[in-house]
Amino acid sequence: MEDRVEISLLMDFYGPLLTEKQSEIMQWYYNDDLSLAEIAELNQTSRQAIHDLIKRCYKQLLSYESKLNLLQKSINRKKEIMNFLEHLKNKYSIDDEDIIKYKEKLENL
């Protein structure tokens, strides 16, 4: 089942690997919330053609993720950072403001 958040994240990682037209249509459909009919009208094509293109792009994004795992690695990295910061907070009594600063620094690495 496709989840809009998952697709947006996949687009963040792998969107540049799609063609300009594919990327634009995915952006319109998932981020700008345009309907298939609206996108079809903008592209002077049928709703079915847009639907098929979106499904192909989604499968392509999943294929990239299955091979490269960039999204999953990023999610795992963020979890590890949060666990590490929570450990620091508990062990060394670091306040939340400092934790936020450390988190931002680690995420920018």
UniProtKB/Swiss-Prot annotation:
Superkingdom of the organism of origin: Bacteria
Ranges in a coiled coil: none
InterPro entries: RNA_pol_sigma_r3/r4-like, UPF0122, UPF0122_fam_protein, WH-like_DNA-bd_sf
Pfam families: UPF0122
Family listed: Belongs to the UPF0122 family.
Function: Might take part in the signal recognition particle (SRP) pathway. This is inferred from the conservation of its genetic proximity to ftsY/ffh. May be a regulatory protein.
Name assigned to this protein: UPF0122 protein Cbei_1174
